[in-house]
């Protein structure tokens, strides 16, 4: 446990950022999973879910939660399987 006031504040800030990042990453994973399920089941709203998943992947990539190449790979897989 840090003793210096600024270090204590930094720990608190880091915990908040970590919680926010984990939440956003989990939301992205859920969106991708829902899109893949819709594609496999040939659901009516699969295009809508794929667009939402791509949007969430792009946001995660911009926030440096995932590497840009991984984001491109996920988007490519979604687009190719949705056709």
Curated annotation (Swiss-Prot):
GO cellular component: cytosol; small ribosomal subunit
Keywords: Ribonucleoprotein, Ribosomal protein, RNA-binding, rRNA-binding
Pfam families: Ribosomal_S20p
GO MF annotation list: small ribosomal subunit rRNA binding; structural constituent of ribosome
Gene3D superfamilies per UniProt: Ribosomal protein S20
InterPro entries associated with the record: Ribosomal_bS20, Ribosomal_bS20_sf
GO process terms (BP): translation
Family stated for the protein in its record: Belongs to the bacterial ribosomal protein bS20 family.
Task performed by this protein: Binds directly to 16S ribosomal RNA.
The name this protein goes by in its record: Small ribosomal subunit protein bS20
Source organism: Staphylococcus haemolyticus (strain JCSC1435)
Species classification: Bacteria, Bacillati, Bacillota, Bacilli, Bacillales
Gene coding for it: rpsT
